[in-house]
């Protein structure tokens, strides 16, 4: 038989060469460019026809399952002409159901009698993005075309690893033969086809025959023990884009399937396939339900248990009776004398009654108090006998816990603001009293000048603008406040102060205490109009002066 030259890639056959298999029920069409490889291709087709004469009906049904043609886009520059040639002949090469899905080999499913016995069914090839021509009977067909980038590297048809596989995608074989676990990866060297003499990769049965499922085939996952070989009457599945065939016999799984299978089975101990898929295409519940349903429940159980345990502990603490501490000597005296004091006095307040009882207790002599101390000692002994494990820390600890639970961050902020306001109350009272004389107003430590004499006072807040000067510490008013403090130290009387004040202020302003409001502390540009308005503001009551200054 004539031998083809195996050295050149694109020169093995004509570029427009088309191949037909008679078992597909289609008529042969010969292209005008078929060359010297016609005899070898006829031998290949005749061998396929002889093997598949009894299975033509199944092959026809497979042709009917084929999806409608769809345009695919080839990224490598070397495949542009080949893609155009394949798309013209839609009778044999038909487009993939999903753009970019790789090559697929469909065996004759009707001829499978035992999954462990290798058979040679008729092979139908669909054109996908990356051709995987691994059958020994079609090596001439594969090598007649331009080699793929994977073929140029190591003569092994390898496709890129998928990047968007479905999390429940297991592995599935496209061959009817079970792999031999002891086959080393060193057999990947190219072999010589006995008919054509063209180098070809080894038979897929010699490699690990496992490919990932496509996302559309997730609903047809087999039983985990019936591994990965399609049974009679079940169609094969398309391979996801760039499906990667592992060179080792080990199973390359994703993260979700490795938790189910890899932890229980070593790669060389996968049982022989003997279970078929569900007829409805629904995966076995042993695959889906343990992973999907148990993961969220495991995350939700722990917080619920912790919440329940905390509630149970709190309820147990509440159920325990509150044990009062034993009474001391003074408490025993109060218990005895309280009724007498209430009868003698008309006071009903508990604090006043306790003060009276305290004075009487201290007025007692040592001998009279010793009686109550003895009663208190007996009380402690009785309490220790009734509650041997009791300690005063139990009650104090409970009180602290209750306070922490009741106190919220809003209440803490509220108490802080209240404390800040209380600090300024004395200065407000001194400024609000109109009866205070001018001398006392300047000499008292709560006066505005004394409050502003130290430059370390904090900055004024927004609420202090409507208040007198004692609460206002704006930088513009520092000079005026220091001058007022200096004058107050030199002249305690109002008459001497009037001579030192500047002329715009004048003596009419000192006829009564000066309400140093925020109008005096305005910026320098607004200072003269504010001083002119001061005589008008003095005719109003003092609370209105602070309001009108806003």
Swiss-Prot record:
Q: Which UniProt keywords apply?
A: Activator, Developmental protein, DNA-binding, Nucleus, Phosphoprotein, Repressor, Transcription, Transcription regulation, Wnt signaling pathway
Q: Which GO terms describe its cellular component?
A: beta-catenin-TCF complex; chromatin
Subcellular localization: Nucleus
**Biological process GO annotation list?**
canonical Wnt signaling pathway; regulation of transcription by RNA polymerase II
Q: Does the keyword Lyase apply?
A: no
Q: List the disulfide bonds.
A: none
Give me the ranges of the annotated region Interaction with CTNNB1-A: 1-61
Biased region (Basic and acidic residues) positions are: 17-32, 52-77, 406-415
The molecular function terms in GO held by this entry are: DNA-binding transcription factor activity, RNA polymerase II-specific; RNA polymerase II cis-regulatory region sequence-specific DNA binding
- Assembly notes: Interacts with csnk1e, ctnnb1-A, ctbp-B, dact1-A and gsk3b. May interact with ase and tle4-A.
Q: Which PANTHER family match?
A: TRANSCRIPTION FACTOR 7 FAMILY MEMBER, TRANSCRIPTION FACTOR 7-LIKE 1
Briefly state the protein's biological role: Participates in the Wnt signaling pathway. Binds to DNA and acts as a repressor in the absence of ctnnb1-A and possibly ctnnb1-B, and as an activator in the presence of these proteins. Required early in development for the establishment of the dorsal body axis in response to maternal Wnt signaling.
For this entry, the protein name equals Transcription factor 7-like 1-D
User: From which source organism is this entry?
Assistant: Xenopus laevis
């Amino acid at each position: 038989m004539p031998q083809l030259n195996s050295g050149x890639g694109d020169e093995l056959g004509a570029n427009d060469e088309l191949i037909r298999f008679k078992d597909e029920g289609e008529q042969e069409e010969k292209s005008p460019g078929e060359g010297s490889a016609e005899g070898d291709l006829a031998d290949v087709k005749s061998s396929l026809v002889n093997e598949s004469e009894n299975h033509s009906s199944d092959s026809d049904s497979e042709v009917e399952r084929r999806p409608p043609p769809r345009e695919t886009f080839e990224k490598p520059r070397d495949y542009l002409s080949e893609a155009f040639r394949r798309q013209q002949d839609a009778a044999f090469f038909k487009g993939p159901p999903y753009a970019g899905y790789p090559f697929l080999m469909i065996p004759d499913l009707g001829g499978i009698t035992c999954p462990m016995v290798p058979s040679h069914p008729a092979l139908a090839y669909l054109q996908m993005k990356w051709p995987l021509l691994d059958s020994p009977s079609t090596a001439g067909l594969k090598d007649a075309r331009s080699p793929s980038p994977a073929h140029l590297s190591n003569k092994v048809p390898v496709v890129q690893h998928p990047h968007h596989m479905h999390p429940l995608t297991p592995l599935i074989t496209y061959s009817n033969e079970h792999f031999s676990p002891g086959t080393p990866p060193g057999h990947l060297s190219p072999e010589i086809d006995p008919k054509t003499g063209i180098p070809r990769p080894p038979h897929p049965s010699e490699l690990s025959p496992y490919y990932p499922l496509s996302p559309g085939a997730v609903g047809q996952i087999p039983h985990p023990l019936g591994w990965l070989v399609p049974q009679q009457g079940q169609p094969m599945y398309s391979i996801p884009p760039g499906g990667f065939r592992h060179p080792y016999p080990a199973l390359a799984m994703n993260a979700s399937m490795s938790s189910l299978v890899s932890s229980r089975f070593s790669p060389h101990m996968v049982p022989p396939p003997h279970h078929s898929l569900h007829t409805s295409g629904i995966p076995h519940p042993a695959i889906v339900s343990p992973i999907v349903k148990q993961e969220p429940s495991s995350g939700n159980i722990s917080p619920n248990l912790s919440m329940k345990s905390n509630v149970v502990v709190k309820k147990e603490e509440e159920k325990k009776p509150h044990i009062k501490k034993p009474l001391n000597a003074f408490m025993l005296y109060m218990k005895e004398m309280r009724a007498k004091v209430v009868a003698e006095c008309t006071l009903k307040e508990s604090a006043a009654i306790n003060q009276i009882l305290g004075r009487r207790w201290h007025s007692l002599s040592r001998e009279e108090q010793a009686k109550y101390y003895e009663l208190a000692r007996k009380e402690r002994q009785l309490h220790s006998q009734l509650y041997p494990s009791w300690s005063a820390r139990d009650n104090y600890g409970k009180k602290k816990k209750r306070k922490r639970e009741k106190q919220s961050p809003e209440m803490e902020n509220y108490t802080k603001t209240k404390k800040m306001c209380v600090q300024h109350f004395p200065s407000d009272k001194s400024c609000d009293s109109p009866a205070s004389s001018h001398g006392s107003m300047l000499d008292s430590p709560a006066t505005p000048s004394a409050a502003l004499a130290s430059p370390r006072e904090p900055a004024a807040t927004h609420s202090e603008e409507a208040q007198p000067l004692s609460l206002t510490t704006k930088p513009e008013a520092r000079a005026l406040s220091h001058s007022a403090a200096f004058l107050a130290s030199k002249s305690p009387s109002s008459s001497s102060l009037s001579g030192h004040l500047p002329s715009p202020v004048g003596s009419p302003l000192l006829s009564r205490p000066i309400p140093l409001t925020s109008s005096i502390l305005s910026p320098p540009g607004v200072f003269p109009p504010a001083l002119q308005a001061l005589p008008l503001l003095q005719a109003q009551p003092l609370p209105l002066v602070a309001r009108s200054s806003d």
